[in-house]
Amino acid sequence: MTEPKPAVDPADLAFILERRIGHLATADEDGAPSVVPICYALIDHDGGSTIVTPLDAKPKTVDWRDLRRVRNIAARPEVSFVVDDYAEDWSRLAWVLVRGPARLVEPATPAHSEAVEALREKYPQ
């Protein structure tokens, strides 16, 4: 019997941890794709890691609940997340792709507090 593989290879996890920006791909209820650049942090848990991203207090033209990525996740929680490095020397190009279910975390919950703490640690303001 073979051992189960981790959801993300340790080398890929290190690559993700070293970067500051990723791209989150979602799809709406009809399957139309949308991709946005995001800031993110990882939270380690006993079964693996969780990628968290803020729906922050920057001025927006809509309430955060009406953001396309939020509506898409509510309709179809399966997402893709990619972190990459571009180099003029194409032999040095690198990227890691993670796929899985996303969920929205409501403010004033322990999970929200944990996410905010992880994001503040990675992106001190």
Question: Which ranges hold each PLM region?
Answer:
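Short amphipathic alpha-helical segments and helix-helix/interface helices
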Residues: 12-13, 67-70, 116
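Charged, gly/pro-rich active-site loop segments
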Residues: 1-7, 64, 80, 86-125
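Extreme N-terminal tail/first-helix region
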Residues: 1-23
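Acidic-histidine catalytic/liganding microenvironments
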Residues: 76
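Short beta-strand segments
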Residues: 20-65, 81-85
